[in-house]
Amino acid sequence: MCGIFGYLGNQDGVSIVLEGLAKLEYRGYDSAGLAAVVEQELFIRKTVGRVQELSNLFQEREIPTASVIGHTRWATHGVPTEINAHPHVDEGRSCAVVHNGIIENFKELRRELTAQGISFASDTDSEIIVQLFSLYYQESQDLVFSFCQTLAQLRGSVACALIHKDHPHTILCASQESPLILGLGKEETFIASDSRAFFKYTRHSQALASGEFAIVSQGKEPEVYNLELKKIHKDVRQITCSEDASDKSGYGYYMLKEIYDQPEVLEGLIQKHMDEEGHILSEFLSDVPIKSFKEITIVACGSSYHAGYLAKYIIESLVSIPVHIEVASEFRYRRPYIGKDTLGILISQSGETADTLAALKELRRRNIAYLLGICNVPESAIALGVDHCLFLEAGVEIGVATTKAFTSQLLLLVFLGLKLANVHGALTHAEQCSFGQGLQSLPDLCQKLLANESLHSWAQPYSYEDKFLFLGRRLMYPVVMEAALKLKEIAYIEANAYPGGEMKHGPIALISKGTPVIAFCGDDIVYEKMIGNMMEVKARHAHVIAIAPESREDIAAVSDQQIFVPDCHFLAAPVLYTIVGQVMAYAMALAKGMEIDCPRNLAKSVTVE
């Protein structure tokens, strides 16, 4: 989950690359570095820490060079040190590489190269690329052949960019199970893990498909090849981006801004996919044979898995179609049953999640009837690899802990459930109107909720706690799974989520005097059951914080503290209560003085398995 940025052109390449790397820090921020060819010698600078630390190394950034490659790292092989930071160079310092991914056969290749007398400077798998390329180039003196031969030896995920000191006007780059995008400017080319990193300079792009590499030369269009050295024609795509992602709009953190973006984002989805009366528009999934599916399999990771889990509950409550939810990293190794009339749904905010992409390939291999993607990036691998893709329309999300992208996923999945129910005749006209109107009220309810000061003030008295239990039932269970994950991600607190009814089957043994238990009581069908679960933990002297509808003032009798949520339709409740969990986690991280936007050990886009 590293970020790559390269530049070839006539401008100040070092400044442009540093700026691009700063926009890619969501992919990793353990260390950073860059390489350039200056007067036929490699110029290398790298450091442990953030891109700003790298920028501080340049008193005068204006360096006479046409080609620069840079990298911001999230460590997978080798601890974060300056030696392990990218770029890596060969023994003779003739070439340098930056790499995102994991080379699965690196130990085998390292043994072979070591046996040939090659010494390695780092502990990383990435150094294999540059040492192997250098060996081939010494023998052939052919850039393209040597690069192709190198790539053919690598198993795993590889996005990389490579420069050679004897070819100062050329950058070699490749994609293999890891994203890499070319940005096409006027007499300049950009190379990046994410097109938004060069959006300021050009909106014209070409995405390398897996198994393709490009020769980027100054003054020429990039030449793209496959590993059989067949030249590939690539269409130029127009990048669309609706906002300046670097603007926090006065908020202290991107995460907080993105939390408060949600009413507007949800309003946009509602206006796009619903009519004024609250009906799902006929154009929604109109080209998908939605009535033909007998079952649904959802595959996702992390927060997207929680969204899929909620979709299972909602869809099965609306229409008689079985829904299976799978963790992507387990799915491809488990060989679950896939019926011939199965709809596969792949959920990924970035559209580049490695395990979810692997599941996509496995589902294709299993001849699944249809694949639907749900993601935020139109040019992503998942968006391009499915039969139809629903886009989150959430805008750029920079905070590592997802907020607005997650609630957009929830709303689109609710729309999917309503569409399925409609085509199967499972809802009366009155139900359709009621459900639609309940969803249309969401943006206003979100605004009202976010004005509730108790969401922020709750955290300080609990900032010394090192563990929390979250309880929820039915639709609230996936919501508390997400809330607990948020507390782990940005406040570094051990937080576990359980269905309320499971407490007496083991987890209640964790309760001691003062243990904080957060109970989400936003599902009317199981409200009384949740009251019983809260009384169980209260009897063991837990400190209970109840998250409940504002009309349920009686909940004060069985809880120590209450946070009230506007009354809403049951389909809107998961979104509102999810936002409660987001703000509570943010408030706790703030109270503990944590780095909220860039939590330790995490990256925004998980592009390695």
Curated annotation (Swiss-Prot):
Superkingdom, natural source: Bacteria
Domain SIS as annotated: residue spans: 285-426, 458-599
EC number(s) from the headed UniProt entry: 2.6.1.16
GO cellular component terms attached to this protein's record: cytosol
Catalysed transformations (reactions): D-fructose 6-phosphate + L-glutamine = D-glucosamine 6-phosphate + L-glutamate
An example molecular function term from Gene Ontology annotations: glutamine-fructose-6-phosphate transaminase (isomerizing) activity
Residue ranges the record marks as coiled coil: none
Enzyme class: transferase
GO biological process: carbohydrate metabolic process; fructose 6-phosphate metabolic process; protein N-linked glycosylation; UDP-N-acetylglucosamine metabolic process
Cell compartment(s), UniProt: Cytoplasm
Alphabetic keyword roster: Aminotransferase, Cytoplasm, Glutamine amidotransferase, Repeat, Transferase
Domain Glutamine amidotransferase type-2, chain residue ranges per copy: 2-219
InterPro entries on file: GATase_2_dom, GFAT, GFAT_N, GlmS/AgaS_SIS, GlmS/FrlB_SIS, Ntn_hydrolases_N, SIS_dom, SIS_dom_sf
Residues at the catalytic site: 2, 604
HAMAP family: GlmS
Function: Catalyzes the first step in hexosamine metabolism, converting fructose-6P into glucosamine-6P using glutamine as a nitrogen source.
Subunit structure comment from the entry: Homodimer.
NCBIfam families per the UniProt record, alphabetical: glmS, PRK00331.1
Record's protein name: Glutamine--fructose-6-phosphate aminotransferase [isomerizing]
Encoding gene (name): glmS
